[in-house]
């Protein structure tokens, strides 16, 4: 009954939001003059869905409930990240602007997908490089960088890019941490990301994801994975200012040492 009620509520809200797409063009212009916007920002403002504070509250509450009922609802998890993460995204923006590498990312706005990355080149790199490690991670876990949801609800295009960057770098973080995509490792990675980025969505996924672990997994999680994730999340360098695409040929062990990543014992 609760599932049916949620689906009905979501359909109504989605229709209401979709009807507002035409409104986006008529809202007041962004603080940055249109001619000064880059390609990502222009494209984002065309597809952004404008929402009121009340709709944002409803989306945040509804998506959190839906994510708890079904952790595989990636659309709801993405929605939760956008409606609850604005403050953390501003902090991430500050951390990226504070480093030369982070500023280059904000200027270039690179994207990570099969159209922008030459994966055959990565596969041909020596096996001890970060690029080869990432390519092997994707192949071993049968995942693709093209599966990430587009950002829709954030008002500021700068924050929209940072959220996009976070999503597209998630698998890179998995590879750097040497964590596959099973439930236990996914929860551990979410703890690392939560402590490293401050995104509320990551905290929620880490806490409630752990609840769904099987008894044997939970014992292993509490004994090894959680302490490891907390130590790394607190001790690592900020990950969002890392220009991963310019580190494909870097030795993976040297990269982990540079970032402060400690291996799982």
Swiss-Prot record:
Binding site for Zn(2+): 170-171, 174, 186
UniProt superkingdom: Eukaryota
Keywords (A to Z) from UniProt: Lyase, Membrane, Metal-binding, Mitochondrion, Mitochondrion inner membrane, Transit peptide, Ubiquinone biosynthesis, Zinc
Listed cofactors: Zn(2+)
GO biological process, one term: ubiquinone biosynthetic process
Cellular localization per UniProt: Mitochondrion inner membrane
Recorded metabolic or biological pathway in which this protein acts: Cofactor biosynthesis; ubiquinone biosynthesis
Pfam families (UniProt xref): Coq4
Record's keyword annotation contains Membrane: yes
Membrane topology classification: Peripheral membrane protein
EC number: 4.1.1.130
Substrates-to-products reaction catalysed: a 4-hydroxy-3-methoxy-5-(all-trans-polyprenyl)benzoate + H(+) = a 2-methoxy-6-(all-trans-polyprenyl)phenol + CO2
Major site of localization recorded for this protein: mitochondrion
Transit peptide: 1-30
A GO CC term attached to the entry: extrinsic component of mitochondrial inner membrane
HAMAP family to which the protein is assigned, alphabetical: Coq4 (MF_03111)
Function comment: Lyase that catalyzes the C1-decarboxylation of 4-hydroxy-3-methoxy-5-(all-trans-polyprenyl)benzoic acid into 2-methoxy-6-(all-trans-polyprenyl)phenol during ubiquinone biosynthesis.
Family: Belongs to the COQ4 family.
UniProt subunit comment: Component of a multi-subunit COQ enzyme complex.
Protein name listed in UniProt: Ubiquinone biosynthesis protein COQ4 homolog, mitochondrial
Protein species of origin: Drosophila virilis
